[in-house]
Amino acid sequence: MAVWTRATKAGLVELLLRERWVRVVAELSGESLSLTGDAAAVEPEPPAAAFNGLPNGGGGESLPGSPNRGLGPPSPPAPPRGPAGEASASPPVRRVRVVKQEAGGLGISIKGGRENRMPILISKIFPGLAADQSRALRLGDAILSVNGTDLRQATHDQAVQALKRAGKEVLLEVKFIREVTPYIKKPSLVSDLPWEGASPQSPSFSGSEDSGSPKHQNTTKDRKVIPLKMCFAARNLSMPDLENRLIELHSPDSRNTLILRCKDTATAHSWFVAIHTNIMALLPQVLAELNAMLGATSTAGGSKEVKHIAWLAEQAKLDGGRQQWRPVLMAVTEKDLLLYDCMPWTRDAWASPCHSYPLVATRLVHSGSGCRSPSLGSDLTFATRTGSRQGIEMHLFRVETHRDLSTWTRILVQGCHAAAELIKEVSLGCTLSGQEVRFTVHYEHGFTITRDNGGASSILYRYPFERLKMSADDGIRNLYLDFGGPEGELTMDLHSCPKPIVFVLHTFLSAKVTRMGLLV
């Protein structure tokens, strides 16, 4: 396992939250990524906004520097309006009396107006000021009138002036409009950013403030802490990124995805490398925990030791011939290659992979390193082929960095060869020239074909690997071997697909050639 140096980093980024881009302060530590809401950035106010606590502008939907500018969804449509201009099918009109404070005014912000095809809406109530103390106003209230002045058809500026001239005592007619609340409510990292999948029993985090699922650690800040252990950091995976500014962080249980946007390509690359580095630095800890968990139940011949585990992307075929990359967790043990759709924290989960392939019947057939990494527009991929009873199963995987590609290439090649040395031999029954025989391939001794004679076996043929001149199969049930002997080509009916034994044969040969130093 390589030694990784953990990175620390901090700065402003944008987070996709409730289909809106909001600015957050990101802080990366060795074990977690903390996101803190930037209140001023989430709902920016124009510079001249201090008339009785009201913004003096067009509602803030497209202010310079706003995260929503040109990026978020369009302004919400106006609620259905009746003949009098009021929203239909909504709660009754309420009359609220508010006494302004000497400093701070009403203490509300408004959005909407006739030019925006919206009623005048209360979009923010400042804590501790007059509106908040009245306990009678709420976000999403439409202001219908101020001291008798009708605001149903008022522009935003007209509403601002009416509230400004209202005097110390203000009588408001308001009506709550539920449909617009999601558009004006400030997104909350604590309540609106779902994130689960941390280890349910993780010794390494048991005494850390970053343990478990993300949480609200400071009552005065909108903050969430994302444990990085077994997360998947990716680029250009689940969301198009034409500007190369996005970073995806997938939870260990694959249920949630966090999308971050940086100011430019270079910043995004820097953040991605730092996050990815810290995730990879936690892998030795994960391997130790997994092997400790599995060691309690593994048998002497179980070979359950996990050699490597990490997230990558697998190419999946969709309807219509389309293809899509999707996250997949790959684990390599002493004998098997395992694929999961989420992190198996428990023994039961570990015992139920989506796919399991014997390494001795698997080989790496492609490992391509493009001139650039996925974060810069080119894919780094490798492919595996496994001989199974159904034929050849092929998987194409994508990694995020050149180092990942190198690691997986080495792990798979060395893992297949080590599995060959560990397993030593494979034996199966078949039919040769009309008689039932047993065909055995031994890593050291080569090929043996025996026949059972009433409890005792007799050797029909025995050849070392170097005598093999040709091997072939029909992909259905027959295996053809030619050792250059007087018997000529041997045709063995395996009664099932010959691909598993063919792949085992090739793995044995590759491992022996590598051991002899003839193949690096």
Curated annotation (Swiss-Prot):
GO terms for cellular component: anchoring junction; microtubule; protein-containing complex; synapse; transport vesicle membrane. InterPro entries: PDZ (IPR001478), PDZ_sf (IPR036034), PH-like_dom_sf (IPR011993), PH_domain (IPR001849), PHsplit_syntrophin (IPR041428), Syntrophin (IPR015482), Syntrophin_4th (IPR055108). Residues 63-72, 83-93, 197-211 have a biased composition (Low complexity). Residues 464-520 form the SU domain. The modification Phosphoserine is found at residues 75, 90, 109, 191, 202, 213, 373, 375. Ubiquitous. Expressed at high levels in the testis. Phosphorylated. Partially dephosphorylated upon insulin stimulation. Residues 73-82 have a biased composition (Pro residues). Its main location: membrane. It is found in: Membrane; Cytoplasmic vesicle, Secretory vesicle membrane; Cell junction; Cytoplasm, Cytoskeleton. Residues 45-95, 195-220 are annotated as: Disordered. GO terms for molecular function: actin binding; calmodulin binding; structural molecule activity. Keywords: Actin-binding, Calcium, Calmodulin-binding, Cell junction, Cytoplasm, Cytoplasmic vesicle, Cytoskeleton, Membrane, Microtubule, Phosphoprotein, Repeat. CDD domains: PDZ_syntrophin-like, PHsplit_syntrophin. Residues 498-520 are annotated as: Calmodulin-binding. Belongs to the syntrophin family. The PH 1 domain mediates the oligomerization in a calcium dependent manner. Monomer and homodimer. Interacts with the dystrophin protein DMD and related protein DTNA; and with the other members of the syntrophin family: SNTA1 and SNTB1. Interacts with the neuroregulin receptor ERBB4. Interacts with PTPRN when phosphorylated, protecting PTPRN from protein cleavage by CAPN1. Dephosphorylation upon insulin stimulation disrupts the interaction with PTPRN and results in the cleavage of PTPRN. Interacts with the sodium channel proteins SCN4A and SCN5A. Interacts with SAST, MAST205, microtubules and microtubule-associated proteins. Adapter protein that binds to and probably organizes the subcellular localization of a variety of membrane proteins. May link various receptors to the actin cytoskeleton and the dystrophin glycoprotein complex. May play a role in the regulation of secretory granules via its interaction with PTPRN. This is Beta-2-syntrophin.
